[in-house]
């Protein structure tokens, strides 16, 4: 049972959020700035101008599992360098390659072995990891090691992992970014979603209310938004214990039974509907909440968005804001929209978890599973 009163009770939220999860999530902008500072101190600029044979994104459990798809989506199909996503450092990695990896687990033995092998073969390695343990030892003195400067739970470090990736892409000349501006947008989003702001003016709380008691169907109308949807589904599972379906709109549209559920189950119930006496308006189908996520405004993405809205008029459109809707030819601006949407879903998932009693006190331990 969701506690609706708690959602607009800042003192009550603070009382149940004993681990400071909302505050940790709101540090997204600070995570980005601190990662940029760590990159400067670690000498990431020595990779400036490099054109690797391949860019290897190692997706260990946790933040990089979300950061890597976001980076690939931002690069798009015109990226001049092959981008390889894998769970472990490939055995073929050599002197012509650049490896990017993130872990919150200092004892990740598989990553430590892979990093050591890649470095011995001459690859350039950029690693965000704790400064102690086997992973850091394997990378010591031979890689660009970005140690965390702000302590946040492992399930809320996507801004750090994403910032490290964006910094590397900028150094390689693959994607120009303004991390100061991106951090500023994250600060603004954190302020809009502050626990002290009521639901009708708080984007994250509003998003939470739209998902209470329903299965979210998170469908992206463009490639970048689809990658955000995947992160949102992970955040909902990690912080609220909610199972969601994440996919691109065209992929979801190819699932006929799911489209039927979405079309029938997304309609709002009649105000006079009695759930105990009346037949369910959805015909007994599961209660779902279709959400159409959008980032890009190129003609193809706009057409997909309109087609999705026409097919599912009851679906909720979700964007980072009109000022952050960008053309597909401006992936640097899209990075800010990606970060803002990801943060909004992180905060919404936390509000949902706290309001439903899944989080709070010792219940927070589950977030640590997503490292």
Please name every model-derived segment.
Residues 25, 68, 72, 111, ...:
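Short, highly selective alpha-helical patches that border small-molecule cofactor pockets
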Residues 82-89, 128-129, 242-254, 317-332:
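A generic structural motif
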Residues 14-72:
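N-terminal, Lys/Arg-enriched amphipathic/low-complexity engagement segments
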Residues 17-24, 34-43, 50, 170-280, ...:
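Active-site phosphate/pyrophosphate-binding segments
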Residues 49-191, 295:
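Glycine-rich phosphate-binding loops that contact phosphosugars or nucleotide phosphates
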Residues 67, 157-164, 228, 232, ...:
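Catalytic-loop motifs flanking and including active-site residues across diverse enzymes
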Residues 1-40, 123-143, 167-170, 177-184, ...:
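Phosphate-moiety recognition in structured ligand-binding domains
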Residues 70-84, 234-243, 311-317:
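Short helix-loop-beta junction
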């Amino acid at each position: 049972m969701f506690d609706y009163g708690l959602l607009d009770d800042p003192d009550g939220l603070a009382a149940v959020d004993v681990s400071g999860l909302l505050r940790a999530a709101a540090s997204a902008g600070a995570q980005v700035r601190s990662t940029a500072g760590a990159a400067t101190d670690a000498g990431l600029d020595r990779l400036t101008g490099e054109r690797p044979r391949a860019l290897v994104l190692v997706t260990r459990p946790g933040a990089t599992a979300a950061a890597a798809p976001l980076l690939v989506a931002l690069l798009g199909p015109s990226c001049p360098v092959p981008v390889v996503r894998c769970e472990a450092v490939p055995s073929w990695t050599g002197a012509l390659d650049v490896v990017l990896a993130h872990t919150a687990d200092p004892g990740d033995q598989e990553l430590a072995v892979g990093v050591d092998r890649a470095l011995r073969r001459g690859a350039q390695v950029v690693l965000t990891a704790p400064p102690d343990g086997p992973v850091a030892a394997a990378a010591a003195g031979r890689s660009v090691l970005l140690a965390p400067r702000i302590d946040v739970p492992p399930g809320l470090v996507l801004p750090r992992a994403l910032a490290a990736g964006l910094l590397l892409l900028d150094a390689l000349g693959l994607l120009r970014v303004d991390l100061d501006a991106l951090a500023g947008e994250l600060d603004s989003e954190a302020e809009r979603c502050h626990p002290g702001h009521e639901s009708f003016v708080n984007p994250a709380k509003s998003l939470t209310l739209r998902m209470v008691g329903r299965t979210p169907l998170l469908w992206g109308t463009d490639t970048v938004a689809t990658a955000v949807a995947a992160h949102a589904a992970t955040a909902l599972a990690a912080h609220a214990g909610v199972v969601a379906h994440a996919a691109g709109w065209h992929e979801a549209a190819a699932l006929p039974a799911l489209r039927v559920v979405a079309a029938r189950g997304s309609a709002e119930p009649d105000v006079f509907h009695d759930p105990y006496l009346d037949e369910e308006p959805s015909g007994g189908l599961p209660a779902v909440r279709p959400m159409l996520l959008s980032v890009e405004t190129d003609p193809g993405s706009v057409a997909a968005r309109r087609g999705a809205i026409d097919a599912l008029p009851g679906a909720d459109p979700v964007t980072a804001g009109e000022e952050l809707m960008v053309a597909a030819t401006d992936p640097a601006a899209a990075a800010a929209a990606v970060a803002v949407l990801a943060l909004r879903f992180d905060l919404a998932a936390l509000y949902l978890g706290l309001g439903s009693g899944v989080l709070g006190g010792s219940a927070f331990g589950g977030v640590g599973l997503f490292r």
